[in-house]
């Protein structure tokens, strides 16, 4: 599957995820929060498209450790942060980036799980550092404080 198609699927998936109803305790199409609205999530889903397209166009099944999943997660969060003040898509970006890259190197759907797993296993220390930066930029809540390896420190 080509990178443009994969990016559009990622955008559509993001928009549909927030459109589900009901989503107890979460923003959805009939319930906003004081600091987040349904439209913030739609915008967030749209603005990740270019980053997902770039990530999927660069991934190479013969050199998985160079996939840079963490970099593209960070790039997507930075792009979202330009448009939206709150964390509206860190979770979906963390999930969809490796799946999208797995799709890019799969000849058919039956290879997606294996290829995505191999991409995840090939992540590097740099990916982890970029992921920590993405979590901090997104200002993700609910992480709790840790004595050691606290994501906020």
Give each language-model segment a name.
Residues 54-109:
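Long, hydrophobic/aromatic-enriched structural stretches that serve as scaffold segments
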């Amino acid at each position: 599957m080509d990178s443009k198609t994969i990016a559009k699927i990622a955008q559509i998936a993001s928009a549909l995820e927030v459109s589900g109803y009901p989503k107890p305790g979460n923003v959805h199409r009939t319930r906003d929060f004081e600091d987040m609205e349904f439209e913030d999530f739609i915008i967030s889903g749209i603005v990740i498209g270019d980053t997902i397209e770039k990530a999927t166009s660069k991934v190479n099944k013969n050199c998985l450790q160079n996939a840079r999943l963490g970099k593209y997660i960070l790039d997507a969060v930075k792009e979202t942060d330009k448009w939206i003040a709150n964390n509206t898509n860190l979770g979906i970006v963390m999930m969809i980036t490796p799946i999208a890259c797995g799709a890019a190197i799969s000849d058919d759907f039956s290879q997606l799980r294996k290829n995505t797993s191999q991409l995840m296993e090939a992540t590097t220390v740099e990916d982890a550092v970029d992921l920590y930066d993405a979590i901090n930029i997104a200002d993700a809540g609910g992480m709790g404080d840790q004595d050691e390896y606290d994501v906020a420190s």
